[in-house]
Amino acid sequence: MVYQSRSFQVEVSGLHQNEVTNQNNYPIRSSGSVFITIPFSRFNEELQRINRLGGKIVNIQPLNLQINEN
């Protein structure tokens, strides 16, 4: 079994609680920044969505999961 998943944890600031962000499955912290885990396959779309909502990307960290069983 070989399983690889490429995901990224993105720290976003500048998002404010509103009708659109209320529909998200993560809360906006009082510091004004949120951490969002994004799979590589949706990375571009999610960054565009964050930009449309007025967010600013503060940090991006890769999260790699690899399982190799022979």
UniProtKB/Swiss-Prot annotation:
Membrane topology: Peripheral membrane protein
Name this protein carries in UniProt: Phycobilisome 8.1 kDa linker polypeptide, phycocyanin-associated, rod
Cell compartment(s), UniProt: Cellular thylakoid membrane
Lineage summary: Bacteria, Bacillati, Cyanobacteriota, Cyanophyceae, Nostocales
Family to which the UniProt record says this protein belongs: Belongs to the phycobilisome linker protein family.
SMART domains for this protein: CpcD (SM01094)
Function: Rod linker protein, associated with phycocyanin. Linker polypeptides determine the state of aggregation and the location of the disk-shaped phycobiliprotein units within the phycobilisome and modulate their spectroscopic properties in order to mediate a directed and optimal energy transfer.
Residue ranges of every copy of the CpcD-like domain listed in the record: 5-63
GO CC annotations, alphabetized: phycobilisome; plasma membrane-derived thylakoid membrane
The encoding gene: cpcD3
The species this protein was found in: Microchaete diplosiphon
Coiled coil (residue ranges): none
Record's keyword annotation contains Thylakoid: yes
Keywords: Antenna complex, Membrane, Photosynthesis, Phycobilisome, Thylakoid
Single Gene Ontology BP annotation: photosynthesis
